[in-house]
Amino acid sequence: MINGIVIIHKEPDYTSHDVVAKMRGICGQKKVGHTGTLDPMATGVLPVCLGSATKVCDMLADREKEYVAELLLGVETDTQDITGKRLAERNPEVSAEMVREAILSFQGEYSQIPPMYSALKVNGKKLYELARAGKEVERRPRAVYIRELEILECSLPVVRFRVICSKGTYIRTLCADIGEKLGCGGTMQSLRRTAVGAFRLEDAYTLEELQQLKDGGRLREAILPVDSVFGSCPVLHVRREYLRLLDNGNAILPEQTAEKELYAPDRWVRMYGADESFCGIYAYEADRKRYRPVKMFLEKE
């Protein structure tokens, strides 16, 4: 079994589930998972986890994300992007400066209402299923955080911008909210995800490129190790005589590591065996003076 992470450059018209299905065929294994849905029309970075790395899917989904989007002003659709049914069209009587002020006003924390065409569940039903049935339900606003907003090009009625945002941010909804603030409406014309955490588009592979690597017996060249997700965490190595504790997912005492370091309570550390094999994420418990396992990644072929 292959254990690791591959950064997919998702192309248009593929769903995230389509990508997972393709990767199962390329890798020849069932244990494959994606780390956050991209709409079929969207392109860009989609980290896919293989084998033991599927345990980090939820962790990657929580990471900050970067997008480049195109906003079409003067158009409103039911899906908040150009794939949906047009609900209203008007001439956007706005200036470039008005657009700039409106867009940049969303930087920081703001309250966003999730779109009906989304995979969020209400009373056990996905919102998009209700929307397709012609039903609309009340959605609670959620706090999202926009760390950076940069206008890349303004050729009215189209505005291209870059955004770095927290998990759970809908760029379609951001586009609609900008249009509403300008009084002319707006919809998302295109979307490309350029980064998920430290994983960037320039390091991504298309499905075709991965198939070519597979055919040439070089697929593992594209696979990142599981611990690449935790690059900011300090490293500890368990001494050889205590490896059995590590293999069983037990707590580890500081003196049972080569470094004997004490880190701040609850600070995550990467725990390795004496042979440099990554085994898991641990956190220090100050009251018990030990490192407790947070999540284990014992790789078994």
Locations of the language-model features?
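Accessory RNA 3′-end/elbow-binding domains used by RNA modification enzymes
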Residues: 1-11, 17-34, 38, 42-45, ...
